[in-house]
Each structure stands twice: as structure tokens, then as C-alpha cells.
């Protein structure tokens, strides 16, 4: 057979296999037995091995690369992948639609919506040039994502070439990668049998599987995808309807959710919401709400975008899922400040698709208020679909032998006394750093990014250092040596040297970071900055009184008493002195006198978006230096919102609440005046 004949045979096999793939993975209608498919696939492989000059990147054999990537490279999206604004109630949905209608050229028209399930997976962007899949990326920050091309190719229902003879010059196809419920359960069952790691939920499994450096691992996972939209498109006339564009994607060879529906007006949207809510547990995939999009593309273009969210679409989230189960025991966990937190151990129950066997009880006031007892049948909710909590007790199911939950007299970790102050809901272990649980959490906080920032000192290594008796106090970290570190499991000489370098680098810090790192109760990042600005050094704080501290912005009576108590404890001062002797230092500064006439003094300010002249932390530092309180969320108590480019949902909320919005130019004038 000559070269032309060989090339034609290869193309025939490729077309045949693509057809089989499409019917099997997209239409769920197998055309041939598996054995016949395998024979065709093997024949194609043999041809390509024998005649590599005819191997092309869109061949079905190229779905998996055997060579692991060194790292994920950044990929810029041609058209940004925007997030959706969320609504949780009917009133919020009505307000969203009302705002959209008011911005249209013809506000009295009846709106038609494309309604889709909101899959709980990982959003991806696939780029096709001349009909060939050239690269794929995660959403990332909306503008730039991670290159996952090799991994996307392992998903059999993703076409490597569009099923049309006249494809667009370039098109971006957006979709959600997920793992079906049944496949997730089967995968976890196999993993348990093999003693391998299992996943907590399908969403985590999908995200973890897709972001593997080795695409062969991705290929071993049961990944699937539904496509939901088009980004950039060049040299191709798209329909003026989102629903018609979804039909076009089907023609191109993509899977589109069969649950997509057309709805008219708000009533149609609410009907779809109730329909999907009722059907949620019967669906083969996880969803956490529904998405409404105005169907007309021309109307979408009229409405445009607010920062990172479109005005023409929103996600209507489902309420937290609740289930019933039995509370069989209560354990106690110890935090950084000694807080003893009760944790419910439950008979395992599936809540919103996740098996829950533990739930927070918050504190003893909550236990008393809800009258929770061991043996009770309780209602469990995944708060925010993430953190399981005990909501209430079903009293009529309470057994005769139900037992009261008692506060332990001694710490479950170190055996020290557990004390609960009369006016506090939280009980605490008094063991301090003698308690291994507190020491571990304290070390983790001390090393964190906003504290001393000791890169490479993570929770696993901290556990080793404390459990092996290598570290007994914070200062012991700075006396670690290469031999000790290198001898630890999974450490090695290179990692040990890197950690020692990070420890040395962390010695040069600032007074506010050092104070924050000490973990004084009720003193967060902002409070530490206020203290550092007014006291400059440890000696000044040692002499501070509660009354004096309370005159400072953002320091209340509780925080003030904790500061005075902390610096009155001899063992705390010993640790501080030892840390300073080991080389921790910061630039000396003069006591700052804040001009109380500046416009930010005493005001609550929220930063959102990107400032072109400075980073978020620098802007925050300037505001704090002017006596402002910088908050992470917008509320009715917010005085100003400083809005940079690509400002997000905080800007929307500020507008809705009537909060004053300051653009970057005005912000710079105020802080520099």
C-alpha cells in the first residue's frame, strides 16, 4: 500500500472511532460491541506507530499523554470566564430580574430565559482553532487559567475535532467537568478495597482528578463534562439565542445537559427551580442550584456586565441540605487558644451527596440551648453546603437512655484542667504550650503567611516536630539544625536546607507581624497593627494598662484585658526574650500620631477590585495608618468602598446599600493629603 492509501486508511479509522465515541459517550447509544471498538482502536495505533508521519494531535489515540507535565502553564482566555451572582430567595430573584428589565431599551418586554442545572464541578474553557482542540484551561481568575489540555483530552466525550465541515476559525467552549454520582461511589469503593485514598465528594474528586500533573491519572478517573456556553468566536455567525447556541454545541459534538429548559418570566424561572429542586436527588450528577440566562444574545449585550458578573444571568442556589441521623458520641478538639470544641460523632448519613459522620456542636451554650444529648436523633445540615452542623433534636425519638453531654474536667490531649468562665460559652484547656494540641496550632499560626511567614513549615511537619519532642516552644524552631530536620520522614537534606533558609529569612519582620504571630487572644491582624503603631516595641506594651489600650481604635475592653494578661505572664515574656535573642528583629519606628481630621479616621472601609498603583496589602496598611478599620465584607455599617478595576460582588452590594464608593484616583488623593 502506498502512502496515500495508508493515509486514507488512517483517516477512515479515525472517523469511524470518532463516530463510535460520539454515540457511546454523548448519545449513550453504542453502535458496536466493545470488542469491535477495541479492534479498530488497536489497528489505528499500529498504523500510527508504523507511520508516525501521519500521526495528528486530533487522533483518538492522543487523548492521553504518557509524559507527566512539569507544571501547569498559564493560559489567557480570549473572552473572560465570569462568575455568576447568586440569589437565594424569590425576592432576590425578583430584584435581579427587575434590575435587568430597567436597563433594557424596551423595559416592558416579557423576558425569555434559558434555564440550566448548576453543576457542582470544575469550570473549564476549551479552545478550538480550525475545528481542532488546541488547548484547554481551568477558569483560574477569570482572565487566566491553568493549562489542562492533556487532562481534558482524557475525557472521552470531549471532541478532539468538531463534528462539522465548516468550523469557526476559533471558538471557546465552556463546560463543567464532573464525576457522576454512581461512578464516584464505584471509584471510592474500589479505592477502599485497594487501601487507596478516597474522595469526600464528587466535586473534589473531579477537581483533583483534572488537575493532575500526570494525565494518565486523570484518564483513570471517571470524568464527564456538560457544556454550557460559548466564549470567543471568530469567523462564524452564531445564533442570537443561548438555547440555539447550546443546540449548535450538540451539533459540534459536545454533551449539553438534558435538563436545560426554556422559561418565560419570573414564574417560569421559579417553576424550573422547584422542578429541579424536587428532582435533585434523582439526578445522576450533583447540583447546588440552577442558572437563569436571558436567552436573547442581543439583550445580553445590551445589559453587559458588572465587574466579574453578567447582568443577564444569575445562579439561584438551593438551600442547605438536611438529613436525620443518630448522635452516638461526642469528642472534644483543642484549638490554638485552648478552646475545647465539642464534635458530634454520628451514624454516617448522606447529606447533599456527602457522607457525614461528624458535625460541629459549636459550644456548650449551643448544646444547652438545643438540649442535645448522646443517643438523640438529630437533624444535620451542611451549612453553606460545606460544614455539617447539628441543627436540632427530634425529641419524640429521644431514647430512655439518652445521656447529657458533660464538659470534660481535663484536657483530652494533655490532661490539664479545663475551665469555663461564667460569662463565656467556650471552655478552655489551661495547659498552654504544654498542651501539644495548642502548641501545634500555635506553631501553625506563628508560621502562617500573615505572621512570620515560614515557608515550608506545614501541619504535617509541625506534627512530627511536636510528637517527636523536637520542638517544645516557639523559639525551638530557630534552633533546629540540618541533621535533625534531614533525618525526619519525607524530609531529606534539600527540604531541610530550604526550611532553615525560610526560618532565617523570617527573622527580619515587622513589629505588627510579630505581635500577630504571638497569637494573643482577640488580637487579629488589624489589632496587631494598631498596637504596633502606638507602642513600637515590647517594653511599651508590657507597661500598657487596660484603660490606655481601650483608647485605641479597634481595641475593646476584652481585647485590652487579654493584651495586659498576656504581657503579665512570665512564660510569655521568656518566649519573647528568647525569640529576640535568636535574631528576630524589625525596623525601629517612632510612635505614630494619627491626624484625626483625615476622612478615613474612625471609618469602616472595604477594598474591592485591583488598584493599579499599589497592592491590596499596601492599601490596607495606608488605611490602618490613618485610623480606619478595614473590613472584608460590605454591610450597612460600611462607610466607604474603595473600588479598583474588576471590582466584584462587594461593589454590587455597596451600590444596593447606598454605601459611598471611592474610585482609585479619589482614594489616592485622600490617603496622600
From Swiss-Prot:
Annotated BRCT domain residues: 595-673
GO molecular function, one term: metal ion binding
Keywords from the UniProt entry: DNA damage, DNA repair, DNA replication, Ligase, Magnesium, Manganese, Metal-binding, NAD, Zinc
Catalyzed chemical reaction(s): NAD(+) + (deoxyribonucleotide)n-3'-hydroxyl + 5'-phospho-(deoxyribonucleotide)m = (deoxyribonucleotide)n+m + AMP + beta-nicotinamide D-nucleotide
Keyword check for DNA repair: yes
PROSITE patterns the UniProt entry points to: BRCT (PS50172), DNA_LIGASE_N1 (PS01055), DNA_LIGASE_N2 (PS01056)
Residues annotated for Zn(2+) binding in this entry: 411, 414, 429, 435
Biological process according to GO: DNA repair; DNA replication
Stored InterPro entries: BRCT_dom, BRCT_dom_sf, DisA/LigA_HHH, DNA_ligase, DNA_ligase_AS, DNA_ligase_CS, DNAligase_adenylation, DNAligase_N
EC code: 6.5.1.2
Cofactors that this protein relies on: Mg(2+); Mn(2+)
Source taxon at top rank: Bacteria
Stored Pfam families: BRCT, DNA_ligase_aden, DNA_ligase_OB, DNA_ligase_ZBD, HHH_2, HHH_5, Nlig-Ia
Amino-acid positions noted as binding NAD(+) in the UniProt annotation, renumbered to this chain: 34-38, 83-84, 116, 139, 176, 293, 317
UniProt GO cellular component terms: cytosol
Signal peptide segment: none
Major enzyme class: ligase
Active site positions, chain numbering: 118 (n6-amp-lysine intermediate)
Family from the record: Belongs to the NAD-dependent DNA ligase family. LigA subfamily.
Primary role: DNA ligase that catalyzes the formation of phosphodiester linkages between 5'-phosphoryl and 3'-hydroxyl groups in double-stranded DNA using NAD as a coenzyme and as the energy source for the reaction. It is essential for DNA replication and repair of damaged DNA.
Name of this protein: DNA ligase
Amino acid at each position: 500500500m502506498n502512502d496515500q492509501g495508508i493515509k486514507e486508511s488512517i483517516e477512515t479509522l479515525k472517523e469511524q472511532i470518532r463516530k463510535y465515541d460520539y454515540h457511546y459517550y454523548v448519545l449513550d447509544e453504542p453502535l458496536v460491541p466493545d470488542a469491535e471498538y477495541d479492534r479498530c482502536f488497536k489497528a489505528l495505533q499500529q498504523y500510527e506507530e508504523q507511520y508516525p508521519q501521519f500521526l495528528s494531535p486530533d487522533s483518538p489515540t492522543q487523548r492521553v499523554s504518557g509524559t507527566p507535565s512539569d507544571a501547569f502553564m498559564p493560559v489567557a482566555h480570549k473572552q473572560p470566564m465570569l462568575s455568576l451572582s447568586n440569589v437565594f430567595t424569590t425576592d432576590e430573584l425578583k430584584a435581579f430580574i427587575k434590575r435587568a428589565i430597567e436597563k433594557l431599551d424596551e423595559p416592558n418586554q416579557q423576558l425569555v430565559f434559558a434555564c440550566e442545572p448548576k453543576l457542582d464541578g470544575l469550570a473549564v474553557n476549551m479552545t478550538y482553532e480550525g475545528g481542532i482542540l488546541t488547548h484547554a484551561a481551568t477558569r483560574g481568575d477569570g482572565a487566566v487559567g491553568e493549562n489542562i489540555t492533556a487532562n481534558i483530552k482524557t475525557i472521552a466525550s470531549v471532541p478532539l475535532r468538531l463534528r462539522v465541515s465548516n468550523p469557526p476559525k476559533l471558538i471557546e467552549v465552556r463546560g463543567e467537568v464532573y464525576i457522576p454520582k454512581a461512578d464516584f461511589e464505584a471509584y471510592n469503593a474500589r479505592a477502599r478495597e485497594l487501601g487507596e485514598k478516597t474522595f469526600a465528594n464528587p466535586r473534589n474528586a473531579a477537581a483533583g482528578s483534572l488537575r493532575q500533573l500526570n494525565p494518565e491519572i486523570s484518564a483513570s478517573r471517571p470524568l464527564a463534562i456538560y457544556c454550557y456556553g460559548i466564549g470567543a468566536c471568530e469567523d462564524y455567525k452564531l445564533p442570537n439565542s443561548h438555547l440555539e447556541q447550546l443546540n449548535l454545541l450538540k451539533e459540534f459534538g459536545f454533551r449539553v445537559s438534558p435538563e436545560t429548559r426554556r422559561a418565560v418570566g419570573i414564574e417560569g424561572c421559579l417553576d424550573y427551580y422547584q422542578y429541579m429542586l424536587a428532582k435533585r436527588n434523582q439526578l445522576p450528577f450533583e447540583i447546588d442550584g440552577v442558572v437563569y440566562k436571558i436567552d436573547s444574545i442581543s439583550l445580553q449585550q445590551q445589559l453587559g456586565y458588572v465587574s466579574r458578573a453578567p447582568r443577564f444571568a444569575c445562579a439561584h442556589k438551593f438551600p442547605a441540605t438536611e438529613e436525620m441521623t443518630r448522635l452516638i458520641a461526642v469528642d472534644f478538639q483543642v484549638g490554638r487558644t485552648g478552646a475545647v470544641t465539642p464534635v458530634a460523632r454520628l451514624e454516617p448519613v448522606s447529606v447533599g451527596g456527602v457522607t457525614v459522620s461528624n458535625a460541629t456542636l459549636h459550644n456548650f451554650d449551643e448544646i444547652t440551648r438545643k438540649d442535645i444529648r448522646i443517643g438523640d436523633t438529630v437533624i444535620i445540615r451542611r451549612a453553606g453546603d460545606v460544614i455539617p452542623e447539628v441543627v436540632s433534636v427530634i425529641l419524640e425519638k429521644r431514647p430512655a437512655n439518652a445521656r447529657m453531654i458533660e464538659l470534660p474536667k481535663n484536657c483530652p490531649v494533655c490532661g490539664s484542667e479545663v475551665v469555663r468562665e461564667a460569662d463565656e460559652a467556650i471552655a478552655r484547656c489551661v495547659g498552654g504550650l504544654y498542651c501539644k494540641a495548642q502548641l501545634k496550632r500555635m506553631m501553625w499560626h506563628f508560621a502562617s503567611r500573615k505572621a512570620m511567614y515560614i515557608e515550608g513549615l506545614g501541619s504535617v511537619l509541625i506534627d512530627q516536630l511536636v510528637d517527636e519532642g523536637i520542638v517544645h516552644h516557639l523559639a525551638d524552631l530557630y534552633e533546629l539544625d540540618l541533621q535533625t530536620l534531614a533525618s525526619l520522614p519525607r524530609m531529606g537534606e534539600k527540604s531541610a536546607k530550604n526550611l532553615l533558609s525560610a526560618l532565617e529569612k523570617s527573622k527580619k519582620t515587622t513589629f505588627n507581624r510579630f505581635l500577630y504571630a504571638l497569637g494573643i487572644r482577640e488580637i487579629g491582624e488589624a489589632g496587631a497593627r494598631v498596637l504596633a503603631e502606638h507602642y513600637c516595641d515590647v517594653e511599651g506594651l508590657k507597661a500598657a494598662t487596660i484603660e490606655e489600650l481601650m483608647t485605641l481604635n479597634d481595641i475593646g475592653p476584652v481585647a485590652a484585658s487579654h493584651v495586659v494578661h498576656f504581657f503579665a505572664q512570665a512564660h510569655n515574656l521568656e518566649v519573647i526574650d528568647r525569640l529576640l535573642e535568636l535574631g528576630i528583629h524589625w525596623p525601629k519606628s517612632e510612635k505614630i500620631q494619627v491626624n484625626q481630621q483625615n476622612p478615613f479616621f474612625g471609618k469602616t472601609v472595604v477594598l474591592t477590585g485591583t488598584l493599579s498603583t499599589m497592592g491590596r496589602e499596601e492599601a490596607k496598611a495606608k488605611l490602618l495608618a490613618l485610623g480606619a478599620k478595614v473590613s472584608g465584607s460590605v454591610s450597612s455599617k460600611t462607610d466607604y468602598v474603595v473600588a479598583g478595576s474588576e471590582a466584584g460582588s462587594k461593589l454590587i452590594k455597596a451600590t444596593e446599600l447606598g454605601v459611598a464608593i471611592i474610585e482609585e484616583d479619589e482614594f489616592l488623593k485622600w490617603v496622600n493629603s
